[in-house]
Amino acid sequence: MTLQEIKEFLLGVTLNTFHQEAWEQPDTYIVWQEDGESDAVHGDNKKLVQILDVTIDVYTKEEYPEIITRLQNAFNDKGIPFELLSIQYESDTKYTHYEYLIQAVV
């Protein structure tokens, strides 16, 4: 999955999707960002394929957020391996923050 495909995929889950920083903060939104290289394929002294870790952060003020079910079902429907890294309540903003990890091929 490319970075553009990740963007389009997340926009299919919610239009409140932002890359790197949310300039709006509705009650529920997603911010995604590339984190760094997790793997690569080399040949003839060149990098042929680069795999990036991509963090997807979901912020919501809902107690039992439907967006989490929608996102995880969408991951499974598209065959995208994912890992839920953490769930944290942020008392200063009143958001619950879900952090996912997926990979992108660049």
Give, region by region, the residue ranges found by the protein language model:
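Small/polar-rich, solvent-exposed N-terminal microdomains that initiate assembly or binding
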Residues: 1-42, 63
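Helix N-cap motif at beta-to-alpha junctions
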Residues: 61-63, 105
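Short, charged interaction patches at domain edges and termini
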Residues: 1-3, 7, 35-51, 85-106
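Conserved short beta-strand edge segments in small beta-sheet-based binding/regulatory domains
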Residues: 20, 81-87
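Residues that form or flank phosphate/diphosphate-binding pockets in enzymes
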Residues: 27, 66, 93
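Short glycine-rich, basic-tinged beta-strand/loop micro-motifs
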Residues: 48-60
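Short, conserved charged micro-motifs
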Residues: 63-70
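A common structural junction motif
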Residues: 14-15, 74-82
